[in-house]
């Protein structure tokens, strides 16, 4: 790769006594796996810099699936996530690691990710709106296009007072039966704008993203959610990471 580009570390693990194997989310190449040789050595200039939520400029080389990190410079200090927001940030990182293919460019999603992490770092009253917006954005970039404003059965515009059932690969169908896949027209309008004025629309957004993300995640649970449940006190529903039910 020629030149520098912006990136964040999604995940890292030791590789030999002195090196790190990293998953990066880069602006121009999407998710890239790199080997940071010597990054764990005592005198390494990279020691402490290759951490999640630290904005980086990076360069790498290589043609295989695992590249060699040539240079990395922090643009600023790590964005200050702690407590609940830290676990939410780890959730977002794990989500990207699980669903993005290697070296597929998602430049717009990179900036949506940056906006999400910056919002979490500002310690909002609830992290849920930022998480729901990011999930919906990611689904859109992955090609999961859903029309929230029209009934898939009739083509008519969604009506606020009606109930609709979600069906994969089709959309929302008017229904008299309510269930886990049922949404009101008002909730669907909130999903279309990614604005959630109250707890009802926020819960509906969470329910929809759980349904939509399930095929991407399969049956394997997210480690970040398990960590949240183990190490943080129980919070109200609106304060939990995205895949908490």
From Swiss-Prot:
<comment type="similarity">
    <text>Belongs to the RecO family.</text>
</comment>
<dbReference type="GO" id="GO:0006310">
    <property type="term" value="P:DNA recombination"/>
</dbReference>
<dbReference type="InterPro" id="IPR022572">
    <property type="entry name" value="DNA_rep/recomb_RecO_N"/>
</dbReference>
<dbReference type="Pfam" id="PF02565">
    <property type="entry name" value="RecO_C"/>
</dbReference>
<dbReference type="InterPro" id="IPR037278">
    <property type="entry name" value="ARFGAP/RecO"/>
</dbReference>
<dbReference type="GO" id="GO:0006302">
    <property type="term" value="P:double-strand break repair"/>
</dbReference>
<dbReference type="InterPro" id="IPR042242">
    <property type="entry name" value="RecO_C"/>
</dbReference>
<keyword id="KW-0234">DNA repair</keyword>
<keyword id="KW-0233">DNA recombination</keyword>
<dbReference type="InterPro" id="IPR012340">
    <property type="entry name" value="NA-bd_OB-fold"/>
</dbReference>
<dbReference type="InterPro" id="IPR003717">
    <property type="entry name" value="RecO"/>
</dbReference>
<dbReference type="Pfam" id="PF11967">
    <property type="entry name" value="RecO_N"/>
</dbReference>
<keyword id="KW-0227">DNA damage</keyword>
<comment type="function">
    <text>Involved in DNA repair and RecF pathway recombination.</text>
</comment>
<dbReference type="GO" id="GO:0043590">
    <property type="term" value="C:bacterial nucleoid"/>
</dbReference>
<protein>
    <recommendedName>
        <fullName>DNA repair protein RecO</fullName>
    </recommendedName>
</protein>
